[in-house]
């Protein structure tokens, strides 16, 4: 909340909202959840259309195609919430979306914001999966080093590098790299070369 007070804008994850209804539908075959999934499917259908477009065009098309669907979904959720029992799984799923509606639909007015954060969650999944294994890194300093290395490895992957080749090359070059040029070894600037 402090960050939001300092001018940051919250962007919600539509996949998290959708997942509440997906789980409800798969576990209880809820008709309401099934109908909600249809709305989410339409929103993601628009995203498939705009994924390769620049941010301005993406925002324009979202406004024309996805905004009416989102408005219809919001009105439908509000109506459904009036008839479902408090405390039910359906009520919880609806409340989750309605409580976060502004954040969930922020992507409609900003073409640079994705509909969900699945991409970033997939990037940090290796860290989350290894978390229990790394509980015993030996010390706080060792844990910080492991975090720095994991960050470098993921950044190298995101920049299209083979992590092992990147690390071997950087660690070989690092002792002779001038401090003023160490930034050249960061994954987004790195060019493979054999040290002199």
Segments from the language model and where they lie:
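Catalytic center-proximal scaffold of phosphoryl-transfer enzymes
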Residues: 1-196
């Amino acid at each position: 909340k402090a960050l939001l007070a300092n001018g940051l804008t919250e962007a919600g994850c539509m996949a998290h909202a959708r997942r509440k209804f997906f789980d409800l539908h798969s576990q209880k075959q809820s008709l309401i959840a099934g109908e909600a999934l249809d709305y989410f499917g339409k929103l993601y259908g628009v995203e498939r259309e705009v994924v390769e477009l620049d941010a301005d065009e993406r925002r324009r098309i979202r406004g024309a195609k996805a905004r009416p669907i989102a408005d219809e979904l919001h009105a439908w959720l509000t109506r459904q919430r009036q008839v479902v029992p408090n405390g039910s799984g359906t009520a919880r799923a609806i409340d989750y979306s309605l409580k976060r509606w502004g954040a969930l639909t922020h992507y409609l007015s900003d073409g640079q914001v994705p509909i969900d954060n699945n991409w970033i969650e997939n990037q940090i999944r290796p860290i989350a999966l290894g978390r229990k294994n790394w509980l015993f890194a030996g010390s706080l300093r060792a844990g910080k080093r492991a975090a720095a290395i994991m960050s470098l490895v993921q950044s190298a992957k995101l920049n299209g590098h083979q992590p092992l080749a990147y690390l071997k090359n950087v660690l070989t070059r690092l002792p002779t790299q001038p401090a003023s040029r160490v930034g050249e070894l960061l994954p987004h600037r790195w060019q493979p070369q054999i040290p002199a």
